[in-house]
Curated annotation (Swiss-Prot):
Catalysed conversion reaction: a beta-lactam + H2O = a substituted beta-amino acid
Gene name as annotated: VIM-7
BP-aspect Gene Ontology terms: antibiotic catabolic process; response to antibiotic
Source organism of the structure: Pseudomonas aeruginosa
Protein name: Metallo-beta-lactamase VIM-7
Cofactor requirement: Zn(2+)
Main location: periplasm
Record's miscellaneous remark: The class B beta-lactamase family has a specific amino-acid numbering system known as BBL, for standard numbering of class B beta-lactamases. A multiple sequence alignment was used to derive a consensus sequence and then the consensus was numbered taking into account insertions and deletions. This allows use of identical numbers, e.g. for active site residues, despite differences in protein length. UniProt always uses natural numbering of residues, hence there appear to be differences in numbering between this entry and some papers.
Keywords attached to this entry: Antibiotic resistance, Hydrolase, Metal-binding, Periplasm, Plasmid, Signal, Zinc
Amino acid sequence: MFQIRSFLVGISAFVMAVLGSAAYSAQPGGEYPTVDDIPVGEVRLYKIGDGVWSHIATQKLGDTVYSSNGLIVRDADELLLIDTAWGAKNTVALLAEIEKQIGLPVTRSISTHFHDDRVGGVDVLRAAGVATYTSPLTRQLAEAAGNEVPAHSLKALSSSGDVVRFGPVEVFYPGAAHSGDNLVVYVPAVRVLFGGCAVHEASRESAGNVADANLAEWPATIKRIQQRYPEAEVVIPGHGLPGGLELLQHTTNVVKTHKVRPVAE
């Protein structure tokens, strides 16, 4: 079990009227919010460390509800947002929660790959005055997929192994994994690594949605992350519960198992 302090999202907070005005209570016992705790259309914040929060939202696909993680990082008197909250409605709720619970403006965002759980809501951010960033490849893939497209390219993130400092974080393009364009974000001040969908939670036994994955390259990509951030203390996956560096090896194991599963079947 990793130890991180929770950011209580309010004793009797309400989602904005436009979102349905549903009440929710603070997370008991400092537990990380799960899919069972968050109705679709609402967002929870969880404090990871000084000036760093995860944001957690849910979305229903078919008959199943999934949770999704993003990150909020303080940058002086502003906030940097890592990933949307998976859709316009959720992202409106996210901005409302940030205003309510943190009270600082979100001025910039980074999307870590082109899927809707990372870029869905970019138009909401843009309308709110947030400068939206991602890699050149993510912009290209998002446009090709008909997804929302962040406005600005981090042109230094063009090839596997590229890294750029962006305010209080380091953004690393480790190579193809869950998607060809997935980025990871490291907050050195608190040793928090946001692995996004390149990294799985500990309970995950399947590689999940691999429609755009590169299963052959994924283990090597994880190895690059391990080599670059051996000092990371908290690792946040794209979906599910945070952990430590063990999540990286776990992800490799899951991906390798997925690769051989069709042969066994």
